[in-house]
Every structure is written in C-alpha cells, then in structure tokens.
Amino acid sequence: MSAQLLKLETSPDLADQVYRVLLDAISAGSLKPGQRLTQEELAEQLAVSRQPVTQALKLLKKDGFVQDAPITGGLAGRSRGLQVAPLDAHWIAQVYEVRSALDVLATRLAASRGTVIDPALIANGRAAVKRDDIKAMIDADLAFHTALYRAAGNPLIEQSALLHWHHIRRAMGEALQSSLLREPVWDEHEAIANAVNLGDAALAEQLMQRHCSHSSTNMGAQMDSNAKSVADGKSATPQLRGSQLLR
C-alpha cells in the first residue's frame, strides 16, 4: 500500500511564479522601497488566492527583499504588515566589492581562453534601452555577465556570482530609473566584449574593473536620490497583471 501523503493546497509552482512576479516588480522599481504590501491587493491584482501570495512574501522576506513595516494605527487597531525593504549606497557598495572581484577574475580568464562574446548579447541590451524596458535591461545585463562567468571555465565563479544577482538586479532597477545611466552601461559592455574577443586579458580586466566601479558609484548615487523622494510607505500599490504569471 502506498504512503498517504497530504494534499498540497497550493501549487509550489504558482507560489514561485508569484515570487518571481513580485521580485521583478521590486527589481524594476514598480514596487518601491518602503512601500507597504498587502496580501489582499496583491492577490486581487494577480488573480490568485492569498495563499501563494503569503508563501511568496515569506520567501521575499527571508531573502531580504521585504521586511516588517513600522506599526501604524492606535493601540486597538494597530497593524504592522510588510513593506519593500530599503536599499542604501553603503550596502550596494559592499555587494559590488564582491561582484567586482568575481567579474574581474571571470573577464580575465574568459579573454585568456580565446572566448568570443556573442554580439547579440550587446544588441539585446541596446534594444531593451530603446524600448525603455527596465526588466529586459536587467535580464540582458545578467545574460552578458553570465556569459563571461561561463566562459571563464570555472563553475565556482558563476555559482558565487549568481548568489548576489538577485540583490544586484534590484539595485539596478533603482539606478535604471535614470535614463542617463542606460546607454553608458552598454557602451562599457561592448568595450569589454571587444577586449575579450581580441584576447587582451589585461585590457578586458581593466575595463571590467572600471565598469564595476562606475556601476557601484552610479547606483549608490541614484539610490540616495530615489530615497529622498520615497513617501512614508503610503504610496499606492502598482497594478500587477495576472497574465504575468503565464509568461
């Protein structure tokens, strides 16, 4: 006789899809730092029950993307709830210290191994900029750097780097709100790719170091600027379409 297992009340895949939709919204800046999150509103906008939303929010809290909100209301009706966790320039600088070390190493190794970076990676990034599609810009950025990690020939580099990318992509979502920072990113990527394709490891390493330094500085400055304009957590919840779960 087979073992009796409890029925799953909610599909793990659905909770994961909700998690990814919310993470994308946080990364793209649709859900802003300090913004309060309510299960009811999110569930209604995504056309799902509250349970997968609850599970997704628990994961987002564990991963550091959301946190307990300040208590509001009187003693009788006070409510804590959740809010999007804030970002700060000091924190992102620390993340970039780690990312820079990994990216510089990966780039040097990729160039020394005769790697050819697919020009479509650059074209995709520039196309995303033209479409004003922040999510696509972030995805293209990750694809470019992942190509370098894999070309390095050391799987530990990719494994280590990708641990930080969920937080990096969120910081990118903040920084890319400024259109002035978008094209220069891909100019730097293209220069790095050209150096790698030429097999010039020293130049590729130098360009990647400069790229990481620029990214850290620009993101920190943009986050400080954005933080000044963030309300006290009462901003309206953006519209998230249920159809996003089907992509």
Residue ranges of each PLM-predicted region?
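Short alpha-helical transmembrane interface motifs in multi-pass membrane proteins
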Residues: 88-89, 171-175
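Short, conserved alpha-helical segments within structured domains
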Residues: 38, 140-141, 164, 208-211
